[in-house]
Every structure is written in structure tokens, then in C-alpha cells.
């Protein structure tokens, strides 16, 4: 049995807290376009010549109320003072009349800040950790794009015309410069192209699809949303689908930061929570709907949401959306409801893994798309140190205790080290949480049987450091951004190498370092080869005993559905169209693509077939 290291975590854990953002010196600038009307100002009952009585003018303006709009059309914007071009209440005013968008309520409900005046930054921007991103770790990342006429990448946000209001929010979020996936994905999306992007967890994918969507809605023509008699049916312009409620809430939180004082209204809908409040939020108007598939199908069947006005469709963690039972729901939403077809809408798919079979399914939703693969940050800088230790089932708890004691002994006094422990079952999560607490290690747990309030409380308690150990099933493995996780422990290894990749991606985020420890025994034999290959591709030390397991013929075929066969990566870092087009002129089709060090990332044009290893050149495995 391998002896656990009592100090290894300290060599790689990033203990620096995220610096608190300083308040902005200037108030928000006004957007520079006037075509957009926020949802709560549309189709108002005010009229200068109709039968409806006009509401009283806003206290901040003496202008006349807007004329009544024809059915199905948008009302002209009222000329309220201070509203800003493209303003109009920030989506928070319901149907009660115009509001100054510089008085938009804090999205996080800070009642003490009634108005975000000049120099006042809302609480929503507090504790943002982007200034802690280690951009030096991104400098040598290989990037590949394939498809026709790929737009060139950008180096700074100043090169991208996103609009003044959105640029102000980028500064409020302390975004210094784009991450690699943002450098490539944002110009592609702003050019109106469909996109399939494969990029590391924690690399800024949410902003990569939110920025173009918000900018496009602000700049786009007024939407002619349908009227459905007396029923209030929400007709969003953009739909963002995600597989879990936690991830949906996280995307919603980030999107509200980015859309602050732009007039773009963001609403979230997910299962496991009362639907009535979500219906009320939708009735107030929605531009961007963030939803899980199950709850969205429910809303569509109730005719409370229509997708016929959708201009933008984004799938986050798209590989999971098209796998593990989600595909029928996603296909029903995208293909069998009233959503515009590919070509009439813009579609963006993002994930950390894109196996070939998932790419084939996803291509049904796309038209003339660009494939983007961004190499793993830790492939050359070893930001995530992976350790695999042989531990029998009966010894796992005592072995975990040894690791936690070593971690506690080496920790900085007063600064808890966040540790995420993954187990396979819900019962196992509850049992291990109780055992840890009984042995002096404050812990909490999150899994599918917890109600929404319990899950939110557990995440808050963990993020704050009040309970620095979180025991979780895979419900927390996908997409969640939990800053400052120093150590991920795979107490129970998953059966699929993709799930392992997503689990360890909870640490080493934003270019920071982290440690991932896995407990391996005979029950995990089918994972041996895939695990050894992943560690080799990531420049990790592979234990000799694991190499022997991997070499055994009886264990060679495991590791889940995405085991490598031939060239390319099991994680889908290579456009499957390249392989299917080989031998029949595929090179001409992809003449617009680029690879390797394009745009200053990655110093070579050969790095293993798209930055994921398995081809010619230096291997580079990335999730």
C-alpha cells in the first residue's frame, strides 16, 4: 500500500485569497445604441389615442408616456431623462413604468443600495476573483480551430466592440484580459457563427458565451414577440441550457453581473424549487432564460414559455446534456418545439470534454460551425498535481483521515483549506459526512436527495470556509465554480474517465495550482489504462503499480465510453469532421482553421491533434 504524503498538498495548493475589488471611480456609462427595449417596457397599455388611460409620468422625467404599440410590436422607448440609450430600467421594474437604469436594484437584493450611483458598485461585484487569475499559466496553451473562414482571435477586451455598458461590467468584474477560450470564442460568436468549443474547466467559458449574447441582444433589432391572448407567455431571445440546477444558478448569477444596467433581463428556471416564483419572474419579462431541460419542458407544455423568438442557444456542459439521459429532452426542446431551426438562430456548445460520438449528436443542432479546442492549462505547468494511491475499501476512511491531518498540520492558522471529497453514492456521502464530523473535521455534503435549500446552504457553508470539507456525488462535479478548492479527493473513483476529469477540474481553476488525490483498488481495475494515459499526457508521475495494472490485457478496455482508439484524444480535443473527411478532400474544407500557437498561445503548430494528445508532436491532454 502506498504511504500517503503528509506535505504534498502544500506544495501545490494556492493559498492566496481573491483580492477584494476596489470600487469603481466612475458611475456606469450609457450604452451607445438605442434599438433595444427592455421587456418590462414592451407593449405597455399607455396610449395617446387609445382607450387605455396613460400612467402618470415618471417622477424623474416630465416626458409624455409612450404611445400604445400595435399588437405584437414593441412600444417606442420613452424619452425619460437619465435612462440611457439601451437602458430602460435594467429589467427589474416589472410592468409598473419606466425606471432609471442607474437605479436598477442590486440583483443580489442589497436593499441598502437603492441606487447604484456614481462611484457605488453593487454587492453583486464583490468577491469576484478574476484578479486572481494566473494569466502566465495560459501563455503556452495550444489552440486549434477548424471550419470555414474562422475569425481571428483578439488579445484584449478593448479590441472587441461589446458596447459601453457591457465593457463597464467587465471592468467591474476586474477582468484584466481575455482567457484563451474567450480570445477565440467571443470573436467567433460576434461574427454570428455557430460554435462547438472544448475548453478546460475554470477557463472562463461562461463569459465566453454570455458576452456575445448580451451584446447581441443590446445591439439587435427590436424583437417582435407573439401575443397569446390573455395568457402571459414568456418569449426569450436567448436560451442557455445546463444539466444541473446548481450550474444553472451559477450561470444566472454570472449573467446578471454581466447584464447589470444594460436593460437585458435574465431569468433562471430549474427543477427542485417551487415553480410559482419562477412563473412570476417570467411574467415580468425575460431576454435570457437559463434553464435545466426538465423544468423548461414543463414550462413549454404549460405554454408559459415560447421559443419562437430565440436568436441564441447555448448549451453549457454540452457533453453531459447529450448523454446520461438528457438527449431526448434536449432534442425535444431544440427540434420538436417552436424553436427556430439551425441557421435561423445562433448555437454555441461548450464543454470540457467532447467525445466523437457526442460531437456527432451535437452537430445536428449546428450549421456551418467552427470547432474550437483549447489545450489544458496544466499540461505544461502541472497546475493540477495528480496522485493515485492504492487503498483497500476497508482502509479508505483511515487513509483519508491521514491526509486531512497532514493537511491541517501544514495549513496556515486561521485560513481553512477547502477539500472536496467525491463519493459514488448518496448514502455514502451522508455516512462519510457524519463520520468526519464525529472525528473532528467539520464537513457538509451535497447530493441528489438534498432539497434545494439544503444544497444551497451546503455550498455557501463550504465556499465561506465554515465547513471546509464538502462530500459530494457527481452532482457537484460538473461546471460549478467553487473558488480556492485546494484539494480534490476521489474517495470513490468514477467508472468513466470523463467524470474523473470533471471532478479534478474543481481545483486548479483560473490558472491556479491544486492537488487531486485518487484512491484506487481492484474495484477500479477497468480505469487503470485510461487513468495512466491521462496522467502521462498531463506530465504526471504514474506509479509503477498503476502501469502494471494498465498493461494487463484484462484491464485494457476500461475507462468508460471514451477510451482512445487510434489517433486523437478520448476527450474530443479534435474535430471529428477531420477524421470523417480524411481521404476525401477534408483539408480544403478546413483551410480556414488554425492550430498550435495561433494568436500567441502555444509555441508550436504540432501538439497532438488539437491540443489533446494522441497525434504527431508533443502530447497535451486536456479535459
Curated annotation (Swiss-Prot):
Its EC number is 3.6.4.13. Residues 10-29, 70-83 have a biased composition (Low complexity). GO terms for molecular function: ATP binding; ATP hydrolysis activity; mRNA binding; RNA helicase activity. Residues 84-97, 555-571, 583-595 have a biased composition (Gly residues). GO terms for cellular component: nucleus. The keyword Nucleotide-binding applies. Residues 186-372 form the Helicase ATP-binding domain. Belongs to the DEAD box helicase family. DDX3/DED1 subfamily. The Q motif is unique to and characteristic of the DEAD box family of RNA helicases and controls ATP binding and hydrolysis. This is DEAD-box ATP-dependent RNA helicase 52C. It comes from Oryza sativa subsp. japonica (Rice). The lineage of its organism: Eukaryota, Viridiplantae, Streptophyta, Embryophyta, Tracheophyta.
Amino acid at each position: 500500500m502506498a504511504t500517503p504524503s503528509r506535505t504534498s498538498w502544500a506544495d501545490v495548493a494556492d493559498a492566496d485569497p481573491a483580492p477584494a475589488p476596489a470600487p469603481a471611480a466612475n458611475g456606469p456609462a450609457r450604452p451607445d445604441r438605442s434599438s433595444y427595449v427592455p421587456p418590462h417596457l414592451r407593449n405597455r397599455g399607455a396610449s395617446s389615442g387609445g382607450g387605455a388611460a396613460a400612467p402618470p409620468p415618471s417622477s424623474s422625467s416630465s416626458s409624455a408616456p409612450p404611445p400604445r404599440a400595435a399588437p405584437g410590436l414593441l412600444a417606442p422607448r420613452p424619452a425619460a431623462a437619465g435612462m440611457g440609450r439601451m437602458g430602460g430600467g435594467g429589467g427589474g421594474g416589472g410592468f409598473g413604468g419606466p425606471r432609471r437604469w442607474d437605479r436598477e436594484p442590486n440583483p443580489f437584493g442589497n436593499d441598502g443600495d437603492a441606487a447604484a450611483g456614481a462611484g457605488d458598485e453593487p454587492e453583486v461585484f464583490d468577491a469576484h476573483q478574476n484578479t486572481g487569475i494566473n494569466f502566465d499559466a495560459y501563455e503556452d496553451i495550444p489552440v486549434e480551430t477548424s471550419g470555414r473562414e474562422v475569425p481571428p482571435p483578439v488579445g484584449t477586451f478593448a479590441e472587441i466592440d461589446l458596447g459601453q455598458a457591457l465593457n463597464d461590467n467587465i471592468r467591474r468584474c476586474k477582468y484584466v484580459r481575455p482567457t484563451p477560450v474567450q480570445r477565440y470564442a467571443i470573436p467567433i460568436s460576434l461574427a454570428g457563427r455557430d460554435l462547438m468549443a472544448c475548453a478546460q474547466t475554470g477557463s472562463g467559458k461562461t463569459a465566453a458565451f454570455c458576452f456575445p449574447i448580451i451584446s447581441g441582444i443590446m445591439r439587435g433589432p427590436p424583437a417582435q414577440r407573439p401575443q397569446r391572448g390573455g395568457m402571459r407567455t414568456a418569449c426569450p431571445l436567448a436560451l442557455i441550457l445546463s444539466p444541473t440546477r446548481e450550474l444553472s444558478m451559477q450561470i444566472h448569477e454570472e449573467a446578471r453581473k454581466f447584464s447589470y444596467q444594460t436593460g437585458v433581463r435574465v431569468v433562471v428556471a430549474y427543477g427542485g424549487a417551487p415553480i410559482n416564483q419562477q412563473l412570476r419572474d417570467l411574467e415580468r419579462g425575460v431576454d435570457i432564460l437559463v434553464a435545466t431541460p426538465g423544468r423548461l419542458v414543463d414550462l413549454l407544455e404549460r405554454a408559459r414559455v415560447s421559443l419562437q423568438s430565440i436568436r441564441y442557444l447555448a448549451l453549457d456542459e454540452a457533453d453531459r446534456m447529450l448523454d446520461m439521459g438528457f438527449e431526448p429532452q434536449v432534442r425535444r426542446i431544440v427540434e420538436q418545439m417552436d424553436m427556430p431551426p439551425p441557421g435561423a438562430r445562433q448555437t454555441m456548445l461548450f464543454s470540457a470534454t467532447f467525445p466523437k460520438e457526442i460531437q456527432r449528436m451535437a452537430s445536428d443542432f449546428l450549421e456551418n460551425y467552427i470547432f474550437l479546442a483549447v489545450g489544458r492549462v496544466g499540461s505544461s505547468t502541472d497546475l493540477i498535481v495528480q496522485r493515485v494511491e492504492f487503498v483497500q475499501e476497508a482502509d479508505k476512511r483511515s487513509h483519508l483521515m491521514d491526509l486531512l491531518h497532514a493537511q491541517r498540520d501544514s495549513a496556515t492558522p486561521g485560513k481553512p483549506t477547502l477539500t472536496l471529497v467525491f463519493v459514488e453514492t448518496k448514502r455514502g456521502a451522508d455516512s462519510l459526512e457524519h463520520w468526519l464530523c464525529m472525528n473532528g473535521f467539520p464537513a457538509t455534503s451535497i447530493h441528489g436527495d438534498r432539497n434545494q435549500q439544503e444544497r444551497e446552504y451546503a455550498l455557501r457553508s463550504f465556499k465561506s470556509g465554515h465547513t471546509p470539507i464538502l462530500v459530494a456525488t457527481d452532482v457537484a462535479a460538473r461546471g460549478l465554480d467553487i473558488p480556492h478548492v485546494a484539494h480534490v479527493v476521489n474517495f470513490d473513483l468514477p467508472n468513466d474517465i470523463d467524470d474523473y476529469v470533471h471532478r479534478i477540474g474543481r481545483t486548479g481553476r483560473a490558472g491556479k495550482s491544486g492537488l487531486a488525490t485518487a484512491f484506487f483498488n481492484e474495484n477500479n481495475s477497468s480505469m487503470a489504462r485510461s487513468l495512466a494515459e491521462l496522467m502521462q499526457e498531463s506530465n504526471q508521475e504514474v506509479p509503477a503499480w498503476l502501469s502494471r495494472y494498465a498493461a494487463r490485457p484484462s484491464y485494457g478496455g476500461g475507462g468508460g465510453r471514451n477510451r482512445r482508439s487510434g489517433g486523437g484524444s478520448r476527450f474530443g480535443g479534435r474535430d471529428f469532421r477531420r477524421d470523417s473527411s480524411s481521404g476525401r478532400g477534408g483539408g480544403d474544407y478546413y483551410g480556414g482553421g488554425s492550430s498550435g500557437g495561433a494568436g500567441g498561445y502555444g509555441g508550436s503548430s504540432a501538439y497532438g491533434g488539437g491540443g489533446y494528445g494522441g497525434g504527431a508532436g508533443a502530447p497535451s491532454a486536456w479535459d
